[in-house]
Amino acid sequence: MSKKIPFVTKEQLEKIVSQYPTPFHLYDEAGIRRTARLVNKAFSWNKGFKEYFAVKATPNPYLLQILREEGCGADCSSYTELQMSDAVGFKESEIMFSSNATPAEDFKLARKLNVTINLDDITHIDFLEKVADIPETVCCRYNPGGHFAIANNIMDNPGDAKYGMTHEQIIEAYKILKSKGVKNFGIHAFLASNTVTNEYYPELARILFELAVELKEKTGAHISFINLSGGIGIAYKPEQQDNDVLAIGEGVRKVFEELLVPAGMGDVKLFTELGRYMLAPNGALVTTAIHQKHIYKEYIGCDACAANLMRPAIYGSYHHITVMGKENAPCDHKYDVTGGLCENNDKFAVDRMLPEINIGDLLFIHDAGAHGFSMGYNYNGKLRSAELLLQEDGSVKMIRRAETPADYFATFDFGEYGPKLAEEAKIKM
């Protein structure tokens, strides 16, 4: 079995903890830049290629700035994600707006910023025209329905997903949009999540490239770009094989040359919207073991909880755990590693074989750089933790402070309880 190795040493982490108390999310700048460059290299054969980082995965302006410096754009799905991306400096075509059940205010802001809009439904054409206007460049999201399979292995069930247009709808949508003055069209689809296979993108590309040729023939539309969206996953478990993004890029190139080039569409730009692949391995949740409990099972209680990393609780997802300083110790103790929420599913690991854990040990929970902090919440009155960046020079920078009681009570800044709660928030233990 291969090993997952933390991107920080025990000595480094102890120094960080002396300044920033656990729990916190820690990100690796060098790893983020390395991953971005690898993705750009994998698709460098396509002159118009651009990776649009899925902001929903890790919405932090400091991290977005790193990705912007590496040539990435921003994939936004909400009003505030648009605002954050604009504040960082992403402009117009550097932002892709992909949303569903979209509020009018979101569309209005997207048009004000002149970003590329990806329409989720054919009815959104009239809705967008009513609340704003129809731009010259529009993308449409496609859902082929049925089950999506690779080599007879079902990857996901698009037919049960709420996203995208049917085959008939997207053809009709192109005709309508063209009649309303749209000059440049894009196609987008997301058919499977967290795939750990080099075949996903090439198979998705085949579906979208064939659709692009058909749309050109049936509507006369100019297909400017095709967005392969996300779905490229990571190996959360040590025994899993990582995706080879260079092989993935080469696989897409072969399909591109097979289908689009002969159709006179060799100038089509390719986009991706990778969130998990870009950030998950380059981030971790760091927590301290603060309690041991010996009942019917052995429990290790941490100062982090599902409010800091929700995936194990709601999806049963595996996140590898390294007990810092005990990387080479035998994994001969079986633990449930838990947080302090009043929910029995608040567990980072169940029946996990780990080295003996003592109170005060630092636990490095791997692959929490995406869908970690971003899915946090305040149930049980828990406060969201800080986010820190391990910079390339080895220094550490706080890129989001930890929440305080004052933050938690901030939305009661009216009426009789506002002043009382503000006073409570000032009390220091």
Predicted segment positions?
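Conserved, mostly hydrophobic/aromatic
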Residues: I32, K56, S78, A110, ...
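Charged (often Lys/Glu-rich) extended helix/loop segments that serve as interaction or gating elements
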Residues: E257-V261, M265-M429
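Active-site-proximal loop/turn and secondary-structure-junction residues that shape catalytic pockets
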Residues: A57-P59, T80, A101-P103, D121-T123, ...
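Active-site loop/helix belt of alpha/beta enzymes
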Residues: P144-I290
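A charged N-terminal "starter" segment
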Residues: M1-I117, I122-E136, K175-S179, K183, ...
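Structured core elements
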Residues: G73, M96, T116-N118, C139-R141, ...
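Glycine-rich, aromatic-flanked loop segments that form ligand/cofactor-binding clefts
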Residues: D133-H147
